């Protein structure tokens, strides 16, 4: 042993010359210190083998090769005669990774970043990488204004050369902006310029965008906003000279100073376009026209470049280059814009592929495409396909990816990546709605039946006032041209009194069939035929009902039956960005019906629904929604429209904050009628000669409803569920009236129900959730304009209604 130590000491002492330039032949290789790494694996990583002649350079290469494996903290190579002695110290293996004190950064995100750097359980620990991670995390906190933050890696040794790794965070508090100064501005005040920033030194309570917490990225965005503000107003020489960010000694306050040079305003003198225009010079020229004397505007220049790219993209030039170079003339304060265009190659579509459609068949998606395989690539056609897939309502998200075909100079594949949502439900259960009380529901509803695109529904409902069942089927592509065919059969037993309406019972059944004819991308016409049988009973005579029965020649009937055949028609304009929870676009839906010969009744009825979504931010998280609903109907040939076909308002789908159906005309019962009491649970006879006023709604033949909503991000909801939950603040208004009402036929204390000016209003908040059980809608509204007989209902909850 003493001899060995002496040998090693002598080797170390003479390490510079032990191998010699002439080298020596390696007869054997021994390792010391290996634990986890196998000898064979270590030998394979070495450039030296038994029998090789090695010198100093070979030994250096061996040390580098062993270090390069990442398995060792220290490597020494010694000579013992003709034996190489390799002494190593293995890096410890990570047994566990934990985090402490991190609030701004989630554990999952930290684990992903660590794994990307090669730090994971079961791998060896590289302390150099660990130091880089500490610094990187601290830099992240500094970028979001937390200058007192610190991140420390605590390594705890364990048996068998293992360690526990714990990252300890001290995040501290975000530094708040104390003051923002802009130096060098003369044309605009500092207050005016800062009002366009996200970062503020003062934030009013009503400002939901401004923020006093400093973030490096937000400052960069604000500086770009400042630059654009000046460039859009003709200041072509504008420049941000410098930016100083000063930190208070306690690291809790920030002072920002921006030094600028405004320069003078410049006007455009002309636009000159050159380059490869691919034969579209006339169209490009239209996009580059300017008004004489127009101020230079950076945003308009960028938009012009984008418009040229979009134009060329429609003709298959998928990767055009458009560069604008302003030529500034300081003498006359003008700018001549030189635009260089290179259309590049025209690309053709080899294949259109779909990814993520595990349920929906390819054919269902492919029939929505406007881009054809083999044709040149049209960016507008690809976008139309995306819009049409979104409007189906089958998918949470739809993304497109244009991929160049390897080895081909002019071919691409277009890939549509979809994320399917649950388009169907099977339910059997008991529910509660504020409009319907306790309800029993059972049914199957599938908007994408077996992935074919068919909509199939078998539904039944039983609640306090209704027993309803329906079977419906719709084929959206009955023909290859997109003509749809839909039909349904239904049965309904309706107790009007229990629905806060006038007293009568209506048992009805019927069927209808409808064809839909697409006119273009956004417009569809519908036409169809329907049949319905209505059996009325338990009718308590009231003025509106009596007026109808009299027109039918049976004024004293307490029971009545009618069979009607109708011609149904409709028109839909749909330019919404997606089928559910839209954020942009408009939808207009006109529906109507008119009785045809062979019917007992003679009347027509038409309604118009509109909805417009206007996003106010680029991410479409803040959206303004305007909705209207109009309805009108009347009798034909001297007959009245049936009272059971009247329009109603009030409830979650019209004017929230009011009980369902309670807005508008109320029943005025005739002398001798059995009327309901105020709580709809006690009855008494009407004994007044002129009739008895009541709170029972009868609806009207005309309706107008409007709503203004402000859709906001839902607080406390992660991005994963953001597309399934919607929160909005709303203002509803509406009314129902009877154009055939005769005030002289009712007691003097009864309002004039022919007056359309009796508008009800409410305001509140709504939450919609696309739950696994179906759409759930919660709303709380406070009526602030109502009339005699209206019934308030602040909280409302329903299943299956969204807008």
Curated annotation (Swiss-Prot):
Single biological process term from Gene Ontology:
Gram-negative-bacterium-type cell outer membrane assembly
Give all residue intervals belonging to the POTRA domain: 24-91, 92-172, 175-263, 266-344, 347-421
Q: Does the keyword Membrane apply?
A: yes
Which residues, if any, are the signal sequence?
Answer: 1-20
Does the UniProt entry include the keyword rRNA processing? no
PANTHER family per UniProt: OUTER MEMBRANE PROTEIN ASSEMBLY FACTOR BAMA, SORTING AND ASSEMBLY MACHINERY SAMM50 PROTEIN FAMILY MEMBER
Q: What does this protein do?
A: Part of the outer membrane protein assembly complex, which is involved in assembly and insertion of beta-barrel proteins into the outer membrane. Constitutes, with BamD, the core component of the assembly machinery.
Q: What protein am I looking at?
A: Outer membrane protein assembly factor BamA
């Amino acid at each position: 042993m003493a001899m060995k130590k002496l040998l090693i000491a002598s080797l170390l002492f003479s390490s510079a010359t032990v191998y010699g330039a002439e080298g020596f032949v390696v007869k054997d290789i021994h390792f010391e210190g290996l634990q986890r790494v196998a000898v064979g694996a270590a030998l394979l990583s070495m450039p030296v083998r038994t029998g090789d002649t090695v010198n100093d350079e070979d030994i250096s290469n061996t040390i580098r090769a062993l270090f390069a494996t990442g398995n060792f903290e220290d490597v020494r190579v010694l000579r013992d005669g003709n034996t190489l002695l390799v002494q190593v110290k293995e890096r410890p293996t990570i047994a566990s990774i934990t985090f402490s004190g991190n609030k701004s950064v989630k554990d999952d995100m930290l684990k992903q970043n660590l794994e990307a750097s090669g730090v994971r359980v079961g791998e060896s620990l590289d302390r150099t990488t660990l130091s880089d991670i500490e610094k990187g995390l601290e830099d992240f906190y500094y970028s979001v204004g937390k200058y007192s933050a610190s991140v420390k890696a605590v390594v705890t040794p364990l048996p068998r050369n293992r360690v526990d790794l714990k990252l300890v965070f001290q995040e501290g508090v975000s530094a708040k902006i104390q003051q923002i100064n802009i130096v060098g501005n003369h044309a605009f005040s500092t207050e005016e310029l800062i009002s366009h920033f996200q970062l503020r030194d003062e934030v009013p309570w009503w400002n939901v965008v401004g923020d006093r917490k400093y973030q490096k990225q937000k400052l960069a965005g604000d500086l770009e906003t400042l630059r654009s503000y000046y460039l859009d107003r003709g200041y072509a020489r504008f420049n941000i000279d410098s930016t100083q960010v000063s930190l208070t000694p306690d690291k809790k306050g920030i002072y920002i100073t921006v030094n600028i040079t405004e320069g003078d305003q410049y006007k455009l003198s002309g636009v000159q376009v050159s380059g490869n225009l691919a034969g579209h010079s006339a169209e490009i020229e239209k996009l580059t026209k300017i008004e004489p004397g127009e101020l230079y505007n950076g945003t308009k220049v960028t938009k012009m470049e984008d418009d040229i790219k979009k134009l060329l993209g429609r003709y298959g030039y998928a990767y055009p280059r458009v560069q604008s170079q302003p030529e500034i003339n300081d003498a006359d304060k003008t700018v001549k814009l030189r635009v260089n265009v290179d259309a590049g190659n025209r690309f053709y579509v080899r294949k259109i592929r779909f990814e993520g459609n595990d349920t929906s068949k390819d054919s269902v998606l492919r029939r929505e495409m406007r881009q054809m395989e083999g044709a040149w690539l049209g960016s507008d056609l690809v976008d139309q396909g995306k819009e049409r897939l979104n409007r189906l309502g089958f998918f949470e998200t739809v993304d497109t990816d244009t991929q160049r075909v390897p080895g081909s100079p002019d071919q691409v594949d277009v890939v549509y990546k979809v994320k399917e949502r649950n388009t169907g439900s099977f339910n059997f259960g008991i529910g509660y709605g504020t409009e319907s009380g306790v309800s029993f529901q059972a049914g199957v509803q599938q908007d994408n039946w077996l992935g074919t695109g068919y909509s199939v529904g078998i539904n039944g409902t039983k609640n306090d006032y209704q027993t309803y069942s329906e079977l419906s089927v719709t084929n959206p592509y009955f023909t290859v041209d997109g003509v749809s065919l839909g039909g349904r059969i239904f049965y309904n037993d309706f107790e009007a009194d229990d629905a806060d309406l006038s007293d009568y019972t209506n048992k009805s059944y019927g069927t209808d069939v409808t064809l839909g004819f697409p006119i273009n991308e956004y417009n569809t016409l519908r036409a169809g035929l329907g049949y319905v049988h209505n059996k009325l009973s338990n009718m308590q005579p009231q003025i509106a009902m009596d007026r109808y029965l009299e027109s039918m020649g049976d004024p004293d009937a307490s029971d009545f039956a009618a069979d009607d055949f109708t011609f149904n028609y409709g028109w839909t304009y749909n330019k919404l960005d997606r089928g559910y929870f839209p954020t942009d676009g408009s939808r207009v839906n006109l529906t109507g019906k008119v009785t045809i010969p062979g019917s007992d009744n003679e009347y027509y009825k038409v309604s118009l629904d509109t909805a417009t979504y206007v996003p106010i931010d680029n991410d479409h998280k803040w959206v303004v929604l305007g909705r209207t609903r109009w309805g009108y109907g009347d009798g034909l040939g001297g007959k009245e429209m049936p009272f059971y076909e009247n329009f109603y308002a009030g409830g979650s789908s019209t004017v929230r904050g009011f009980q369902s159906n309670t807005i508008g005309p109320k029943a005025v019962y005739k002398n001798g009628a059995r009327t309901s009491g105020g709580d709809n649970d006690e009855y008494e006879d009407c004994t007044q000669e002129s009739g008895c006023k009541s709170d029972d709604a009868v609806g009207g033949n005309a309706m107008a409803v409007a709503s203004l909503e402000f859709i906001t991000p839902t607080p406390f909801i992660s991005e994963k569920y953001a597309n399934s939950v919607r929160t909005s603040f709303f203002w509803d208004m509406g009314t129902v009236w009877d154009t055939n009402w005769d005030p002289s036929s009712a007691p003097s204390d009864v309002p004039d129900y022919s007056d359309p000016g009796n508008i009800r209003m409410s305001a509140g908040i709504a939450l919609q959730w696309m739950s696994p059980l179906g759409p759930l809608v919660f709303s709380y509204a406070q009526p602030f304009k109502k009339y005699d007989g209206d019934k308030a209902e602040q909280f409302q909850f329903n299943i299956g209604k969204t807008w």
